[in-house]
Amino acid sequence: MKKILVIGDLIADYYLWGKSERLSPEAPVPVLEVKKESKNLGGAANVANNLISLKAKVFLCGVVGDDLEGKHFISALKAREIDTSGILTDKTRCTTLKTRIIAQNQQIVRVDKEIKDPLNADLRKKLLDFFTEKIQEIDGVILSDYNKGVLDFELTQKMITLANQHHKLILCDPKGKDYSKYSHASLITPNRAELEHALHLKLDSHANLSKALQILKETYQIAMPLVTLSEQGIAFLEKGELVNCPTIAKEVYDVTGAGDTVIASLTLSLLESMSLKDACEFANAAAAVVVGKMGSALASLEEIALILNQTHPKILPLEKLLETLEHHQQKIVFTNGCFDLLHKGHASYLQKAKALGDILVVGLNSDNSIKRLKGNKRPIVSEKDRAFLLASLSCVDYVVVFEEDAPIKLIQALKPDILVKGADYLNKEVIGSEFAKETHLMEFEEGYSTSAIIEKIKRTHND
């Protein structure tokens, strides 16, 4: 179980749910007939709550007011088994409270009660002391900045410096214009509007997105800069090139807290040694779960697995693939096949193909295509499952299913730098080679084939 230290602004989320069917006689405003009330953990506490849902151990550090809301807040945290030993009480401020009025599942107004003044020197010192005490025993740090006074410039920089000195991953969810506050963090997660506001740069093109992320990396020394783009997913840099990790299509009911879910799931994914690309895919799946619920919702590992099993961000229709790769300057490698009963020979072949370039696109024969080519008893594994298995390989960047017997239209549209086929195509015409800059024939690993596996299963069954 990973241990995560979360520091930031603590917010109590209060919801009034009901229906509104008339206007007030006192003013032209709707009247809400309250049917239900609920309280949620918000801000940095929602990040902590998301981490708990993902099976992490969480230490939460922040400030509440000396009031009833603060006491209820601490009790709610303890009920979720979140360590509250780093939470301080400030008698000069109220606990930040956001009240949302929901009518017919639509938010109609929000009322904020808060004090955003910076913390006094004594409280800042106590927070830093707690951070210093815990830094050696935890695996990673999240700074959840809602601009409510906890994370000022000096405290933020001291915490980032300490985390780096102890070689701890530190991620920041930023607010405000001055991103020098987050200099030298491992990763920051601004959304499009926040990054535009901070850099005074309109992120309306791939070129400007790339420029913005380069600024974060070079000017602010952010090791892994990225930007969340709502329905367009997450964009980040890989070897200096812009990469977009597409979102998982799902009906959106409420985006409240989605950013907290993203940074929580990114942190745990990276601590589990996932690549940034795979971590973003996991975070997109987690976000897809929570936006399908009302309020500051949570995503469980089981729900995320269900989303990923339903689809996979690497599995794209041709039109979406072309849109994704439109501005890539990296070398694209393409190969295709049935990949029925995925085995070591397939994996070895795909790893070698990926090594020839930067992005590996795999064209996958559909079920109908395989039946025409190999008979009605094939495929053994459905196209949905075959596509998911291929997409799960780290060497595969994208999978495209095609219905034709041969992927000529796919290759013509993609125009790969390198077209890879098996060495059994020696002295044969390689379909689509005229649309690729280079054709490479590759040996298969001996002793592995789907047909041989099927025959072995038959023999074993007959015995």
Swiss-Prot record:
Annotated keywords: ATP-binding, Carbohydrate metabolism, Kinase, Multifunctional enzyme, Nucleotide-binding, Nucleotidyltransferase, Transferase
GO cellular component: cytosol
Active site: 260
Domain of life: Bacteria
Ribokinase: annotated span: 1-315
E.C. number(s) listed in UniProt: 2.7.1.167, 2.7.7.70
GO molecular function, one term: heptose-1-phosphate adenylyltransferase activity
Subunit structure: Homodimer.
Family: In the N-terminal section; belongs to the carbohydrate kinase PfkB family. In the C-terminal section; belongs to the cytidylyltransferase family.
NCBIfam families (alphabetical): cyt_tran_rel (TIGR00125), rfaE_dom_I (TIGR02198), rfaE_dom_II (TIGR02199)
Protein name, as recorded: Bifunctional protein HldE
Region (Cytidylyltransferase) location: 334-463
Residues the entry annotates as binding ATP: 191-194
Protein's job: Catalyzes the ADP transfer from ATP to D-glycero-beta-D-manno-heptose 1-phosphate, yielding ADP-D-glycero-beta-D-manno-heptose.
GO biological process, one term: ADP-L-glycero-beta-D-manno-heptose biosynthetic process
The keyword ATP-binding is assigned to this record: yes
Gene3D superfamilies (UniProt xref): 3.40.1190.20, HUPs (3.40.50.620)
InterPro entries: Bifunc_HldE, Cyt_trans-like, PfkB_dom, RfaE_dom_I, RfaE_dom_II, Ribokinase-like, Rossmann-like_a/b/a_fold
Catalytic activity: D-glycero-beta-D-manno-heptose 7-phosphate + ATP = D-glycero-beta-D-manno-heptose 1,7-bisphosphate + ADP + H(+); D-glycero-beta-D-manno-heptose 1-phosphate + ATP + H(+) = ADP-D-glycero-beta-D-manno-heptose + diphosphate
